[in-house]
């Protein structure tokens, strides 16, 4: 299944998505521009199975991490014309 994962700038650096991932494809990276000092990095999508547990774990009102499956990938990420 073709899918993509996007980390939005609303990430609060809480690590909930990283801990929720059963395949350990997400990681936090240092980022000086954020009050937590870290932010979720783009995952290894070749290992991601699209379970969306990271989305479910995200505590922000606007999901900071989104998994786009199949056709919604290009539309939802604003890549379709």
Curated annotation (Swiss-Prot):
Protein name in UniProt: Photosystem I iron-sulfur center
Cofactor: binding comment: Binds 2 [4Fe-4S] clusters. Cluster 2 is most probably the spectroscopically characterized electron acceptor FA and cluster 1 is most probably FB.
Keywords: 4Fe-4S, Electron transport, Iron, Iron-sulfur, Membrane, Metal-binding, Oxidoreductase, Photosynthesis, Photosystem I, Repeat, Thylakoid, Transport
Catalytic activity as recorded in UniProt: reduced [plastocyanin] + hnu + oxidized [2Fe-2S]-[ferredoxin] = oxidized [plastocyanin] + reduced [2Fe-2S]-[ferredoxin]
Subcellular location: Cellular thylakoid membrane
Cofactor(s) it depends on: [4Fe-4S] cluster
Amino-acid positions noted as binding [4Fe-4S] cluster 1 in the UniProt annotation, renumbered to this chain: 11, 14, 17, 58
Binding site for [4Fe-4S] cluster 2: 21, 48, 51, 54
Biological function: Apoprotein for the two 4Fe-4S centers FA and FB of photosystem I (PSI); essential for photochemical activity. FB is the terminal electron acceptor of PSI, donating electrons to ferredoxin. The C-terminus interacts with PsaA/B/D and helps assemble the protein into the PSI complex. Required for binding of PsaD and PsaE to PSI. PSI is a plastocyanin/cytochrome c6-ferredoxin oxidoreductase, converting photonic excitation into a charge separation, which transfers an electron from the donor P700 chlorophyll pair to the spectroscopically characterized acceptors A0, A1, FX, FA and FB in turn.
Keyword Nucleotide-binding listed: no
Pfam families on file: Fer4_7
Keyword Membrane tagged: yes
Domain 4Fe-4S ferredoxin-type: 2-31, 39-68
PROSITE patterns for this protein: 4FE4S_FER_1, 4FE4S_FER_2
SUPFAM superfamilies per the UniProt record, alphabetical: 4Fe-4S ferredoxins (SSF54862)
EC annotation from Swiss-Prot or TrEMBL: 1.97.1.12
Record note on quaternary structure: The cyanobacterial PSI reaction center is composed of one copy each of PsaA,B,C,D,E,F,I,J,K,L,M and X, and forms trimeric complexes.
Classification via PANTHER family: PHOTOSYSTEM I IRON-SULFUR CENTER, PHOTOSYSTEM I IRON-SULFUR CENTER-RELATED
Gene Ontology MF term list: 4 iron, 4 sulfur cluster binding; electron transfer activity; metal ion binding; oxidoreductase activity
Organism: Prochlorococcus marinus (strain MIT 9303)
Listed HAMAP family: PSI_PsaC
A Gene Ontology term for the protein's cellular component: plasma membrane-derived thylakoid membrane
GO annotation (BP), single: photosynthetic electron transport in photosystem I
